[in-house]
Amino acid sequence: MIKGSVKKIETLGLVDGPGIRTVVFLSGCKLRCKYCHNPEMWKLTELNYTPEELAKRIIRNKPYFKRNNGGVTFSGGEPLLQSEFLIEVCKLLKKENIHIALDTSGVGNGNYEEILSYIDLVLLDIKHVNPEKYQELTSHNIDESQKFINVLNKSKIPVWIRQVIIPGLMDNNEYLYGLKKQLQKIKNIKKINFLPYHTLGKEKYKELGIEYPYKNLDAMDKEKCQKLYENFINILNKD
C-alpha cells in the first residue's frame, strides 16, 4: 500500500494559485537552500496518509473551491519527491474535477510526465539562474530542475514563476538580465512573482539545532523588491 508523508495541511490559502485553496505540504526535499524557511520539511517523516485518506480530506473543501475557482496546491518540501503517492492522490482528485496546482523547484525523482498529466498549474520556484550560484545556494546542481523544465515545456500547462529576491544576490541588473534569458526558455508563463527574502524561519533553525546560513542578512525591503520587479518587467519588454 502506498502511503505519503504529509507535514501539514492549510485551508483557505489565497496566494498559492487561483481562488481559495487547500495547500498540502509534503515532506522531503533534496535541496538545502540557504534561505529555506521550512527546514523541518527537509526529511521524509512518518508515512501518515494513504492517497484515499488525503483525497477525502481535500474533497471535503470542494464547495469552497467551486465558489471561488479554487482547488488544491501541493507544496513542501518538494512534492515531486513523493511521485507515486502524488500521482495516486491526483488521480482521485481529477475524478472530482478539482483544480490541481504544483508548487515545485523541479527537483524530484522523475515520473515528471505522468505527474504533469494531472496538473493544471505549475508554480515554479527559480532558485538561481547561474549553475555555480545555484549549487552554492542549494547544495545541489541545476541539472535536475532543467530536466523538469524540459518536460514541462512539452505540456501546455500554465506556469507561474516565483523568484525569491535575496539582498546582494538577485537585486541587480546582471541577475535580472540572466533571469530574462532563463525565462525565455520556459513556455506558457502566465505570471511572475518576486518574493522578498524574509527571516521568519530563523527560529525554526534554532529549534532544530541547525545554524542558519543567513543569520546576519537582513530581510529584503518590500518596496525595493517591488521596484526591482517593475525594472524587470521593463527589461522583459526590451528587444
Residue ranges and their predicted role:
Residues 23, 27-30, 48, 52, ...:
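Electropositive phosphate-/nucleotide-binding environments in soluble metabolic enzymes
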Residues 2, 8-10, 14-49:
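Canonical Radical SAM [4Fe-4S] cluster-binding loop centered on the CxxxCxxC motif
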Residues 1-18, 167-239:
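Auxiliary Fe-S-binding modules of radical SAM enzymes
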Residues 59-63, 68-71, 76, 80-200, ...:
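Conserved AdoMet/S-adenosylmethionine-binding subsite of the radical SAM
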Residues 39-44, 135-141, 209-217:
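Short glycine-enriched, charge-decorated loop/helix-capping segments at active-site entrances
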Residues 39-68, 72:
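Conserved alpha-helical substructure of the radical SAM core
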